[in-house]
Amino acid sequence: AVIASSSAIHGRFHYRYGGDWERCTRTQEITRDKNGKNGKYTVTERVRGWTDEDEIGLFVQVGAILRGESEITWGEPLYLSGVVTRNSPLWVSNPKQQIAYLGVKYWARLYCPEVILGVYSPDEV
């Protein structure tokens, strides 16, 4: 949001997705027993319904028009299989949205570091 509302870019971010993202749309519900300070309890969680192999070849490429330029500056493709830290449950329910967000963050660090000004999210610290 900081980048999009700054004058560093003209317009909005652009996205290119590659691969068959339909492979990563299934989720499943599991029930697990956990131990807490008050004893054992059961939790229900939503987990991904796809394998690591299903993620191979899936990527997003993020780009934007930098101030003073007329063409889109595209970042490098970001592959889903290469994303290790997935702290949000949205990685299970909406991986395309999450990888797009991560792609914008990487793009901004590379092409507009002056806008970020050293601000880091908790998973980057």
What do the predicted segments below correspond to?
Residues 1-125:
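Glycine-rich anion-binding surface patch
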